[in-house]
């Protein structure tokens, strides 16, 4: 989870900075080309914070960066630096709402539906297998070599993967840069694309207009928090529900930690009790990341004692 920082200290995994930088068509092309391992040319400028809504009664979504290639393929790139347990189903919902906007009302041939990519870049491992990249396409269970050619692809990228030999060096460097967006890291890469992205990052951080937008967003978030606290004082039941949601999140994290550790062997009762008894949400988040990286239960136990 990324702490509150000044604009100059933000990493590219931060959603605000990511949207600002990827608003540049060339930078967006560079990022997509690195991720997909092929040269991508965009048809028009990307749209950041693009909203999709199918009805006033349905939940809308706001995509970080939406773009369309010259071939008509559509892309949504999302930066995720806050741990969430619903990203898999969220990607399904994003896919459905994005698809709903791609065909004109009178089009009857669904083969005209654009190919699409949902790309989520996270600074934690959603699946716990230490991969930099997880790519999902629909396949037939009864015949594993039979794909469902619906043109939909969902990719989850993990900045902390360990399978360097299975992905390109440029992708590894890009994901490392997403989480460590510094002059030093940019200077160590041999990728011209990453260096161009870094130039755009520095330009955004120096921009007075971007700085004003960032300050405004921070003020709006703070105002929302204050308003939420005031409303909570007025409505004790609301506060109770909020506490319930926080406890619910922590319970999910406790379960996720234990699931990851169970993959490494039998979890001792005393360690299970320690995890179940932890009440600090930030500590649980840190333990979850440690469990995802641990090579053994003993390794995890040693780390949390430090």
What is each residue range found by the language model?
Residues 1-208:
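Conserved single-residue anchors adjacent to enzymatic active/cofactor-binding motifs
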Residues 2-8, 16, 68, 75-80, ...:
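Short, charged alpha-helical interaction segments and adjacent helix-coil junctions
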């Amino acid at each position: 989870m990324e702490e509150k920082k000044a604009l100059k200290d933000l990493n590219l995994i931060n959603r605000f900075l990511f949207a600002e930088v990827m608003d540049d068509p060339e930078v967006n092309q560079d990022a997509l080309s690195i991720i997909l391992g092929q040269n991508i040319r965009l048809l028009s400028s990307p749209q950041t914070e693009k909203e999709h809504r199918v009805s006033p009664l349905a939940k809308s979504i706001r995509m970080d960066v939406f773009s369309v290639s010259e071939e008509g393929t559509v892309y949504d790139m999302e930066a995720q630096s806050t741990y969430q347990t619903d990203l898999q189903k969220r990607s399904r919902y994003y896919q459905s709402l994005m698809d709903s906007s791609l065909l004109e009302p009178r089009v009857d041939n669904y083969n005209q539906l654009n190919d699409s990519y949902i790309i989520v870049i996270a600074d934690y491992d959603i699946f716990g297998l230490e991969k930099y990249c997880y790519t999902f396409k629909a396949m037939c269970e009864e015949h594993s070599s039979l794909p469902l050619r619906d043109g939909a692809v969902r990719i989850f990228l993990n900045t902390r993967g360990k399978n360097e030999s299975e992905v390109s060096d440029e992708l590894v460097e890009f994901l490392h840069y997403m989480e460590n967006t510094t002059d030093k890291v940019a200077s160590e890469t041999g990728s011209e694309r990453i260096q161009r992205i870094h130039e755009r990052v520095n330009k955004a951080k120096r921009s007075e207009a971007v700085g004003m937008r960032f300050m405004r967003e921070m003020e709006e978030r703070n105002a929302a928090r204050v308003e939420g606290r005031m409303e909570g004082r007025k409505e004790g039941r609301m506060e109770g529900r909020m506490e319930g949601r926080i406890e619910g999140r922590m319970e999910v994290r406790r379960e996720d930690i234990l699931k990851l550790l169970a993959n490494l062997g039998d979890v001792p009762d005393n360690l299970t009790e320690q995890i179940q008894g932890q009440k600090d949400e930030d500590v649980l988040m840190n333990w979850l990341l440690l469990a995802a990286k641990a090579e053994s239960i003993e390794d995890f136990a040693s780390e949390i004692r430090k």
